[in-house]
Amino acid sequence: FAETGQLYRGSKPVMWSVVEKTALAEAEIEYHDYQSDMVWVKFPCEMVVRKGPTVVPGQSEWNQLASLAPVDEKLLSASVVIWTTTPWTIPGNRAVSFNSKISYGLYEVTAAPPGNWAKPGERLVLADELAEAIRKAAKIDSWERRRSLTPEELAAGECKHPLHGYPYPGEYGFRVPLLDGDHVTDDTGTGFVHTAPGHGTDDYQIWM
């Protein structure tokens, strides 16, 4: 292997047995059917204008085009919404993934029950194909679609971590980038994928 160049040093997330105190191969993992609770999580937008077109080795084409994207002030008060059945991985979040082939829209809530997680006036960024299902599941009475978002705008965007400032000021103060990934679909969820590189291979690969 060494003579043919197949031996290399790398890194990847691996399964870990708390009981055995050792790493586990994927072939050793058995999954049982389990009904999980799901949560919606809002990532407040921080759309950033990057100065001048720059080419960064290793960056995707969309991220390089992001330097040309204008910023809509309405997006500064919007939130990218993710859907997850593994809320315990949120502290490990370092990015949100989208798919440049999916159509996304900016939706402004116009009516919602008292105490709802989404309040009138809030703006949410979602995949258009899933918007109506999300509205019903989230018990939002009505909203209006304000406009479309381009892949360039999404790639130019960054979000605040949902735990920003918790439990102490300055905690989780880093920005969360939006990354283009083919593994994101509009079959279920919101069209955005919470990305925690320490909790999955897809997450790790796109984040790296």
Predicted feature locations:
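NTP-handling and nucleic-acid-processing catalytic cores
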Residues: 1-208
